[in-house]
C-alpha cells in the first residue's frame, strides 16, 4: 500500500521523530504541495501503481511558507460543540456569486481551497465535521499569515455555525503572529469573538431596504430614493429595535453609506470605515457572515400570536445528536446543577443540568432518540 509517514522535527537539534504512518494522504498535504510544488496525489497514485518515484530527496526544494486552516462545523466560541443543519449561502475565497464554480487556485494565487460544501447542502453529525481547508502560501510566514486572514475574511458560511470566525481571530492574534503559541495555548487563550454591532447594522440596513422597496425600485440601489419626499425612518425589530434612517444615512445615529451590493454581499461605510459582509434576511431570521463569523438575529413576528414562553426552565439541545441517558421522569424533584439528560454527538458527551431547584414537567427526551439543535427536551418548573 502507498502511504504517508508523519514525523515531528525538533528545530533546536534537527532530529526527526517518527509519529505515524497512514495509507492515505495527510490532511495537511496541501501545505507540503504549496512549499514544494509537488503533486502528492499524483505521486502516490504512481507508487500505488507500481511505478518508481520520479524524483529523489535531493530534487525536493522548499519555497516559502504555507499555513492551513481546517474549516469545521462547530461552535468554537460555544465550547467547540459540533453543529449541523442546512447551509443557506456558502462563499469560499475567490467566489462571490451564488452559483460560482468551486474555488480553485490559479498559478499566481496565494490561496488554495479544498472543499465539497455548497449552498443548500445538509451537514450532518453522522460524519466528520470538517467542511473544507483554506491554505495560504507566501514568501515568509507573515506573508502566508496575512493571506490566510484575508482568505478567511472572504469565507462566508450561513445556515449553520462554523469555526471560520474563530480561525480568523486566531490567525489575526498577536500571539499567532509572533509565533509564541504552543499546544496548550488554546486552553488559556482569550480568542475574542467579533462584536455583533456591525453585523446588526448590516442586517438592519438590508431589512429597512426590503421593507421599503417599491415596484419600480430595487432593495440594493445605492443612489438613494427617487421619490419626491424622503422616506421615513424604519424601526427594524431584531434582538432589540434598531432605527434606520436611509434619508440621513444613519443606523441608530451611526453614519452609514452604502458602497456596493450584489448577490447578498453588501459593502458599507460605517462611521467612515469600509466593511463588507454577506447578508441573508429571511422572514424569521437574519444571518450575517462578518470576518468569517456567522451571526444570526431572530426576527420576531410582530403580527402573530406570541408563543408560549417556556422561561429559563426549558432544557433544549445545544447541539444535534443522540440522547444517551435520561436520568429523570415526569414529576421528579431535582436540585440545581443536577444532571437531567446526557447527549452525544461527534464522540462528545454533554450533560444537561437543571438551572434551579424544581420539578420535572413536559419530558420529551427518550434514550436513543435523535434530537435536533434547539429541540426542547424537558422543562423544569421552579419551586415557588
Model-identified regions with their sequence ranges:
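Catalytic cores of soluble metabolic enzymes centered on carboxylation/carboxyl-transfer
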Residues: 8-11, 30-257, 339, 369, ...
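Short strand-coil-strand connectors
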Residues: 238-241, 252-254, 271-273, 289-293, ...
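Conserved metal-phosphate-binding beta-hairpin within the catalytic cores
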Residues: 1-26
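Catalytic P-loop NTP-binding/switch module of NTPases
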Residues: 274, 280-318
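Short, hydrophobic/aromatic-rich segments at coil-to-beta transitions
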Residues: 230-236, 261-267, 285
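Conserved nucleotide-binding/hydrolysis modules and their immediate coupling elements
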Residues: 245-275
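Structured functional modules or segments
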Residues: 306-384
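SH3/SH3-like beta-barrel fold
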Residues: 268, 288-289, 352
